[in-house]
Design a protein with these regions (language model features):
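Long, acidic (Asp/Glu-rich), low-complexity accessory segments flanking structured domains
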Residues: 1-55, 62-103, 107-108, 152, ...
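Short, flexible/disordered intra-domain loops and linkers
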Residues: 32-33, 82, 121-126, 186-187
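Acidic, His- and aromatic-enriched active-site or binding-groove loops in soluble protein domains
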Residues: 83, 132-149
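Active-site groove signature of glycoside hydrolases
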Residues: 105-119
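A residue-level signal for conserved active-site and pocket-lining positions in enzyme catalytic cores
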Residues: 111, 175, 313
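Short, aromatic/basic amphipathic alpha-helical patches
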Residues: 125-134, 186-196, 324-332
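Surface-exposed substrate-engagement region within the catalytic domains
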Residues: 143-303
Length: 345
């Protein structure tokens, strides 16, 4: 769907469907998602990409001799079931995204990366090695946040970063990391790891009902609304107010003005619902219904026209219909593209 959008628009300006805990479609103990507290997705990552998802939330940890995908302490598995499934590795996810971009170079995929559990020192070292390997082997598949990739300290790289246009990001993984990599000394890898999001967890408790900027040295601002323990009505207010903040529609006391070059992650996900039970699936039933039915997310509605920007809408249990609600809010004739691809975005 990005193929119909102009190169000159900032990637941060687009309305982008994203997934929370993207690798959890087959996770330890997820045989019944209704009762499971760690499964957050039905679609595997390749299916998400073909449904229109363009932002992935990847959680990983050191396990054995590799970095595996996890939700907390629970390991994610490959699509195979019964005794044939294997641990899902970070490398395999990168391979999946790169293969997708090889086939669809008009698209860009934002990836946020976090070590969710385990030995952080070993995990950090392993991630540095993996990312050095992949950015060296696939330099055209990773967005370089600085003008050129050369050895920098983390702070120096942060001060040289610029927000990408869609044209600059096409065909690339646009990486942002919640991992503290400052101990790597001078490294060209800092040109690829994006704005420093290590203070994410200092900002997620959005009790003021709007998105908050993550403190960092980066010249590219990143805002998040990610209160995952909020009651249903409060979470709805947080999601909606973040959209109003993005568009300057209402004056929200204390809320910072968001520029078009700024990235905004607006999480609809949470741990449970007052109405549908204390699981991510229960929360998704409540929040996803809002996206399906509310005028704010309805293409062409008066409210949508007054609030054209949604940011990166990060969801649990995403599907094609949810993605279309976000994608069609670009004020661009995307219907024809969807129909030509047989329903794939």
């Amino acid at each position: 769907w990005m193929s119909l959008l102009p190169d000159g628009r900032y990637l941060s300006e687009l309305n982008i469907p994203g997934t929370h805990d993207s690798a959890t479609a087959n996770v330890e103990g997820s045989w019944n998602a209704s009762y499971n507290k760690v499964a957050c997705q039905k679609y595997f990552i390749e299916q998400q990409l073909y449904a229109g998802v363009r932002a992935l939330d990847l959680r990983t940890r050191w396990h054995g001799d590799d970095m595996v995908m996890v939700h907390g302490d629970f390991i994610c598995h490959t699509p195979d079931h019964n005794n044939r499934s294997k641990n899902k590795t970070f490398r395999s996810v990168l391979d999946t995204v790169i293969e997708y971009l090889d086939k669809h170079p008009s698209e860009a995929v934002i990836v946020t990366l976090k070590i969710d559990s385990g030995d952080e020192d070993k995990g950090r070292l392993a991630l540095v090695n993996i990312l050095n390997e992949y950015t060296a082997n696939y330099p055209n598949r990773f967005y370089c946040w600085t003008e050129t990739a050369f050895p920098n300290t983390l702070v120096a790289a942060q001060n040289r970063m610029t927000s990408p246009t869609l044209g600059q990001a096409r065909g690339k993984i646009v990486l942002m990391t919640r991992v503290d990599m400052s101990g790597a000394g001078e490294s060209s890898l800092y040109s690829y790891t994006g704005p420093d999001l290590t203070k994410w967890d200092d900002s997620y408790k959005d009790r003021n009902h709007y998105a908050q900027r993550i403190e960092s040295e980066s010249k590219v601002a990143v805002y998040i609304q990610d209160d995952y323990s909020s009651p249903d009505g409060n979470k709805k207010k947080q999601v909606f107010n973040t959209v109003y903040q993005l568009n300057g529609t209402y004056t929200l006391p204390g809320a910072l003005k968001i520029e078009k070059k700024d990235f905004v992650f607006n999480y609809t996900s949470k741990t449970g619902s007052d109405h549908y039970g204390s699981t991510p699936l229960g929360a998704a039933k409540y929040m996803n219904d809002l996206i399906y039915n509310d005028d704010l997310f309805t293409p062409g509605s008066k409210t949508a026209k007054e609030n054209p920007r949604l940011g990166i809408v990060v969801m649990d249990f995403v599907n094609k219909q949810l993605c279309r609600r976000i994608v069609f809010r670009q004020n661009t004739p995307l219907d024809d593209l969807i129909h030509r691809r047989g329903g794939q975005a």
